[in-house]
Each structure stands twice: as C-alpha cells, then as structure tokens.
C-alpha cells in the first residue's frame, strides 16, 4: 500500500504541475482513502479492501483520461490490475472462488481500459496538458505498469514454488512415516 500511496503523490504533483488542480486534489484524497483501505486490511476485511482498490484504479483511469487524455497513459493501470488480480485471488484466503474472481476482476479492469479508450475517441480532454508532459507521464505510467506486472508475476511464481516445496516436504514426511507404520506395510 505504501507504493500505491507514493504513486498517487507522484500523480498529485504531476497534476498540480500541469494545472489540473482538481485531479491533484483527487489524488491527495486517494492517498487518504488508501490509508483507510490499509485499515481494512489490518481488520482482516481484505475482500472489501481489494474491491475498493479495483474500483479506485478504474475510476482514476477514467477521470485521468477525461481530464488529460488517453495519451497520458493512466489507463495502463487497468492492464496491470490483471496481474494483481491473479496474484491476490490466488494468495489471499478470502477469495474462495479464485478463478471466477480473477476473471471478474480482470474483466472489470479490461472494461475500465476500454471505457478510457472510447472516451478518448468521443471526448476531448477537459484540461489538455502540453505534449511533452503527456509523453513524460505516458512513459512514467508505462514504466510503473511494467514494474507492477513484473513484481506481481514474480510474487505469484514465488508463492507457487513455495507451496510446491511445502507439499513435496509434506509428502516426503508422510512417506517416511508410512515406512515406519506397521499398518501401511
């Protein structure tokens, strides 16, 4: 959550620096909201925390697209959320139907991406920013997207390998016990 907070502080600075004050204020509000989401996680309300996070990412992408345009790249976080959803629904125990929930969260993220795209076709940005600022923000957003995807895929691989190693160790332990147990001979 700290990384998400830092990311939204970066967004707030970008928006204020480019004169999109309302999005700067929105990002400060999101920083505060993420502190509340962190409290939900501490209270073991992880399902609600993740649902709120998914909604926030899509809403932020849509608002940023409306204000500064598709070319700034805020919609790429919807793509990153697919990798996050795969990891979270696999690891967090509150997700009982991992595959179904992964699909639902991923579809919601894809929907958000395409809403941003359609908005860019039919709506001019409310507060267009200079082309250089757009390019810089697109590069920053794409870089963060790749980092998020890489980190969550690596976490997923690590978790799968860890579970596999634990299962193999348990099987070895059971094999050893069965060799000593007269009932299994």
Descriptions of predicted regions:
Residues 175-185:
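Conserved nucleotide-binding and Mg2+-coordinating catalytic segments in signaling enzymes
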Residues 124-126, 143-169:
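Juxtamembrane or sensor-core-proximal signal-transducing alpha helices
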Residues 1-7:
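The first (N-terminal) embedded transmembrane alpha-helix
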Residues 24-30, 135-145:
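Alpha-helical transmembrane segments of polytopic membrane proteins
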Residues 8-128:
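Juxtamembrane segments at transmembrane-helix boundaries
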Residues 7-10, 35, 147-154:
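Alpha-helical transmembrane segments
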């Amino acid at each position: 959550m700290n990384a998400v907070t830092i990311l939204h502080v970066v967004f707030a600075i970008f928006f204020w620096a480019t004169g999109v004050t309302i999005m700067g204020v929105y990002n400060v509000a999101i920083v505060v909201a993420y502190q509340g989401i962190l409290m939900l996680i501490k209270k073991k309300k992880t399902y609600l925390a993740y649902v709120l996070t998914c909604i926030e990412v899509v809403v932020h992408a849509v608002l940023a697209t409306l204000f500064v345009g598709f070319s700034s790249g805020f919609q790429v976080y919807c793509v990153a959320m697919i990798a996050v959803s795969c990891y979270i629904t696999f690891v967090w125990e509150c997700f009982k139907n991992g595959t179904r929930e992964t699909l639902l969260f991923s579809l919601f993220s894809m929907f958000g991406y395409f809403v941003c795209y359609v908005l860019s076709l039919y709506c001019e940005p409310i507060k267009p920013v200079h082309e250089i600022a757009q390019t810089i923000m697109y590069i920053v957003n794409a870089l963060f997207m790749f980092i998020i995807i890489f980190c969550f895929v690596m976490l997923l691989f690590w978790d799968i390998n860890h579970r596999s190693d634990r299962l193999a160790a348990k099987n070895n332990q059971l094999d050893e016990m069965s060799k000593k147990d007269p009932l299994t001979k």
